């Protein structure tokens, strides 16, 4: 990663060894990662994220000053999904999908579950599917060992996996 002079980048030092341990420990199954993040090049693109991705959350408000409300706010930074894809594949996992949360939940047929849900659950779920909010900004990475997507998933998943493989690890 080459940073520009003055550019700030968030780096999770323990992400690689942790993900490597998780991948090695999986003898058969899926490793599903859901979080805010991007593929490596997009994550560190100085034209978009010159000041990094650190965000401070307090009472449904977001700001960038980690020293403002010490001890009373959550701090978060975006995940380098390119790193996770690379590490998982180095450890023998097969990348089935890297997509946004909304298409993932729709492929999980969340709509069918909402038919019987109460109004509050429907409203909360709508936030997860919002194309300008969480449905757009949260990514889902699915990697597998000894699992054939044909054996495990409904046709909706197979379509999603095929589309995300074509897009490699850069969902648009």
List each model region and its residues.
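Long, Lys/Arg- and hydrophobic-enriched amphipathic alpha-helices
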Residues: 1-172
């Amino acid at each position: 990663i080459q940073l520009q002079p003055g550019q700030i980048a968030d780096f999770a030092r323990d992400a690689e060894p942790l993900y490597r341990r998780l991948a090695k420990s999986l003898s058969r199954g899926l490793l599903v990662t859901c979080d805010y993040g991007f593929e490596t090049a997009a994550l560190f693109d100085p034209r978009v994220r010159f000041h990094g991705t650190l965000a401070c959350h307090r009472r449904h408000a977001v700001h960038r000053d980690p020293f403002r409300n010490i001890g009373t706010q959550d701090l978060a930074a975006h995940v380098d999904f390119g790193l996770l894809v690379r590490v998982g594949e180095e450890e023998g996992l097969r990348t089935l999908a890297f997509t946004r949360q909304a298409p993932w939940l729709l492929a999980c047929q969340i709509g069918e579950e909402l038919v019987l849900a109460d109004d509050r659950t429907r409203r909360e779920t709508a936030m997860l599917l919002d194309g300008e909010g969480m449905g757009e900004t949260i990514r889902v990475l699915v990697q597998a060992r000894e699992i054939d997507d044909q054996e495990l998933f409904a046709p909706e998943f197979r379509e999603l996996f095929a589309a995300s493989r074509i897009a490699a690890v850069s969902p648009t």
